[in-house]
């Protein structure tokens, strides 16, 4: 059974992660937010792809559900922390964290030499 303390502890070990308030939630982000923790510590919303969301919801319907608005259609997924094991929480956090990493700049302009 995972807890809010577990989420915070694991998230802050992921490279570049910071914690900041986000409305009534705690947000964990690198370049972008990848997970938010509810104020009551019972649930968290993870940044997943729609395909990852579908898989999580099919394999663990007691733990995962789409966020109930337009964000859910983009893959944002609510997890009930008490329904997750520690390793399941760690896998979900790492998956979401990877989606929030800065994108490489493929076409960076070089300075003009004069």
Regions found by a protein language model. Give the residues of each.
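Charge-dense, helix-prone N-terminal extensions
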Residues: 1-114
